Amino acid sequence: MQRSIATVSLSGTLPEKLEAIAAAGFDGVEIFENDLLYYAGSPRQVRQMCADLGIAITLFQPFRDFEGCRRDRLQKNLDRAERKFDLMQELGTDLVLVCSNVQADALGDEQLLVDDLRLLGEHAGKRGLRIGYEALAWGRHVNTYQQVWNLVRQADHPALGVILDSFHTLSLKGDPSAIRDIPGDKIFFVQMADAPILAMDVLEWSRHFRCFPGQGEMDMAGFLAPILATGYRGPLSLEIFNDGFRAAPTRQNAADGLRSLLYLEEQTRLRLEQENTPIEPGVLFSPPPASAYDGVEFLEFAVDEAVGARLGNWLKRLGFAEAGKHRSKEVQLLRQGDINIVLNAEPYSFGHNFFEAHGPSLCATALRVKDQQAALKRATAFRGQPFRGLVGPNECEVPAVRAPDGSLLYLVEQGTAGHTLYDTDFSLDNNATATGGLRRIDHMALALPAESLDSWVLFYKSLFDFAADDEVVLPDPYGLVKSRALRSQCGTLRLPLNISENRNTAIAHALSSYRGSGVHHIAFDCDDIFREVARAKLAGVPLLEIPLNYYDDLAARFDFDDEFLSELAYYNVLYDRDAQGGELFHVYTEPFEERFFFEIIQRKAGYAGYGAANVAVRLAAMAKARSGAARKPVL
């Protein structure tokens, strides 16, 4: 299908937008009238610019408030339409979007609306042009696609057809299944926009909160599937009104837009297959299926020699063993349970460059996959950027792709005993024994600039087939934190993404420390939280101190005896229980050099959350720790 995007979806000048659209790989573009009005060149120059860039002008928009206008305005509106037709012919497009009338004095008589639309179609048809009629969700008399099709069907003019917009239907909780009743050749154009589910005025919702398919919470595939079932094979276009998009980097946002269409096509193809609705091969994007995942293979920290020594000491106090050194690089391996941590201090390497840019930080995460080549092919099909580092003789070459912040995601197949990447690349100490009982990485949390959250969500959903939980808002003493968790389909990889638009929150401090986004929190799973915390305290791990008032509140909320509450308080263990009786015990370290911190976690009886009930007290405790005012519990 022809992939298109409206110029209003991107920031920048019209030439910048068109260049970004072409660079991203779109086939076409909707020219939004304001972009043309603010451009100093002529419509013919815009037409030539698009031709030079290899993109077609799929549509000109919008033409407003025509049908049902007061009768004394009808001729003026027809004159206005003729001027727009002149402009369209200069642009070289034959289709204009006419949106339903929103004027308070618009007339609603059905036959009058039919006659007006037929008249407009006649004027357009004489010039070889077409009218696409679209229902605005806030239209005065017409606000659903069913009404649009009813009017278009009665007008019965070959130059008049339907334009379908996902937001205008789904925002009103409309049922798209009846789209199947519209002949495919009468659907002239399709616009797609996702959005978070919000309880607000639909006009404000549309103007400020639309996003690319896959970034929001609407059923995009459920809307597109019945359209394709009609036989429609025309353009599939993005029309996004979003405050953040208006300020986002143009090329990066355009690339996200194309990725979102590819993701939507895949999801729609899968939906149609589930519904046993045949569709010819090649119509929709068909990438390699997502690989199965099995957690994190290793984490790689960018350090220098001094920081590596300090972080290594921290990890050893947490129970990690120094398991080996790289055969040819300044890289150290630490292990505990199924957790592998690499400290990369190699000069003139990717890790070194990352350290220079961000300081001590997580520069790479290795995902354990069933088929690394299939996973890499899928990632590159979704326009992921592959990475190849320097590989020494007899060393294992591990494929990787860049994350949106420039860090790396390695794709690692689990080798057999004696034939893993650790065996080939490291001189292993077979006598090294971890002193702790941490088992695996439970989850990792990222601090992101607010404007980048949607891009990260789409990246993981498309390249790796992750699912996204609903967004939650969490209280920090100095503002609000918004969090949206991603997880692999198998549940072994979990990535809460955190943003804050306030300058003094913990997330804001992390962004300042990293000079950009980064992992600020890593959680390790264990079988016995009290044993692990007792050992960590004895080893001198600096644990985050929790106010005693928190435990008084626990006593009020849960039926705990005094001895158990005292144990929780002594070890600074936080507690939560879900509606099904699942339990969470977790404790936090203080941040390593004011950057990232670790969490020790124990889940019981199927608890699957992240302890949202404890976020406020944890963030308050971290704020006090930053100011040096933390209070130790006294029993």
Curated annotation (Swiss-Prot):
Every VOC domain range: 295-414, 440-590
Reactions this protein catalyses: 3-dehydroshikimate = 3,4-dihydroxybenzoate + H2O
Molecular functions per Gene Ontology: 3-dehydroshikimate dehydratase activity; magnesium ion binding
Positions with a binding annotation for a divalent metal cation: E134, D165, Q191, E239
PROSITE patterns, A to Z: VOC (PS51819)
EC category name: lyase
UniProt function note: Catalyzes the conversion of 3-dehydroshikimate to protocatechuate (3,4-dihydroxybenzoate), a common intermediate of quinate and shikimate degradation pathways.
Family: Belongs to the bacterial two-domain DSD family.
Subunit organization: Homodimer.
Name this protein carries in UniProt: 3-dehydroshikimate dehydratase
